């Protein structure tokens, strides 16, 4: 779990919409989904501000949402997730109501890189030495069982090593 690409692969490989749908149904699966700890529209800049993003100065005008600044930093870091969508919420912008993390292709890339880096450290991950994760859940609950199965299926489908 210390490998950043391994952690990203798991985060990008989990179809949170399918996972939540097991409890609230397809119609509401995105209703409670947030893509960052703090909502992107939590605060706006009161005045023009210049921010250093990986060595590049970027000026944001007054009224810029916090989420836009966070998204710009994430993009500059090369992390392929969306925590702020300026077109969401009928054009008002939001970090909520969509799954900005799930992307099986990106998960596959991240896990491939993780496996390569871990191999360089002497750790073999292959069909004979697979990654195994234990998920604790109340098997007496159909909802929890379905959620665990959803988690398992989405991770296995989106990572090259299952």
Model regions and ranges:
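Append "and occasionally in soluble cytosolic enzymes with long acidic Gly/Pro-rich linkers
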Residues: 2-158
């Amino acid at each position: 779990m210390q490998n950043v690409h391994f952690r990203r692969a798991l985060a990008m490989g989990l179809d949170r919409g399918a996972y939540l749908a097991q409890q609230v149904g397809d119609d509401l699966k995105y209703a409670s989904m947030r893509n960052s700890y703090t909502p992107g529209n939590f605060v706006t800049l009161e005045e023009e501000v210049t921010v250093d993003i990986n060595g590049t100065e970027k000026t944001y005008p007054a009224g810029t949402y916090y989420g836009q600044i966070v998204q710009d930093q994430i993009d500059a870091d090369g992390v392929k997730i969306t925590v702020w969508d300026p077109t969401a919420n009928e054009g008002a912008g939001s970090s909520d109501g969509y799954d900005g993390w799930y992307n099986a292709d990106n998960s596959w890339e991240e896990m491939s890189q993780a496996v390569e880096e871990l191999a360089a450290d002497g750790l073999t991950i292959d069909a004979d030495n697979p990654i195994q994760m234990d998920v604790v859940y109340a098997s007496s609950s159909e909802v929890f069982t379905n959620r665990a199965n959803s988690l398992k299926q989405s991770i296995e489908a989106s990572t090259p090593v299952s």
